[in-house]
């Protein structure tokens, strides 16, 4: 079982925790992570793009000039895609980009993402993370104590408005509840800061 240190908000190691081999010690499957990230990004697309074909552009029903005898190129409509103001060839239309992938693949991808953070020493476990009131300065100091100077995702076991509001004002820092974590966010941020109770909940669900 992978073993990592547990820190307090002052950056001091207070104990150690043995992580579940089935969650934080699996063989990293990069293809599964790729498929899930691609799926997440596709599902986020609005798909509202739209343009008109030559049949949908208003006007252009009359032939601009006669077919022969003018010396000019033959034209059937001023709404031809070749003309300014004409229709669009294969014009994009609103569509739904979302699709589903097997639950087994999603679980494997999440475990792979968590394991990759452990393998690259980018996982920080906190004994607890509590703030009496929203204070950005206090959150900045906590990150400084943990030597976090890059993008970080903070995962909590229980919702804390004080923590969320304190982190919202810090560029490159995002908070998430343990039941909302996903592969894209885990890989997007350089550091994964997770509370001890959140680790236990992750292992309960995915072990």
Swiss-Prot record:
Record's compositionally biased regions (Basic residues): 60-71
Taking the record's annotation, the residue ranges forming a coiled coil are none
Q: Name one GO molecular function term.
A: rRNA binding
Q: Which Pfam families match?
A: Ribosomal_L4 (PF00573)
Question: What is an annotated GO biological process for this record, any one?
Answer: translation
What UniProt keywords apply to this chain's record, in alphabetical order? Ribonucleoprotein, Ribosomal protein, RNA-binding, rRNA-binding
**A Gene Ontology term for the protein's cellular component:** ribonucleoprotein complex
Gene3D superfamilies of this UniProt entry?
A: 3.40.1370.10
Keyword Ubl conjugation listed? The answer is: no
* Span of the signal peptide: none
Q: Which domain of life is it from?
A: Bacteria
Which residues does the annotated region (Disordered) include?
44-71
Tell me the subunit arrangement. Part of the 50S ribosomal subunit.
According to its UniProt entry, the function of this protein is described as: One of the primary rRNA binding proteins, this protein initially binds near the 5'-end of the 23S rRNA. It is important during the early stages of 50S assembly. It makes multiple contacts with different domains of the 23S rRNA in the assembled 50S subunit and ribosome.
Instruction: Report the protein name in the record.
Output: Large ribosomal subunit protein uL4
Species of the source: Alkaliphilus oremlandii (strain OhILAs)
Taxonomically, what lineage is the organism?
A: Bacteria, Bacillati, Bacillota, Clostridia, Peptostreptococcales
Encoding gene (name): rplD
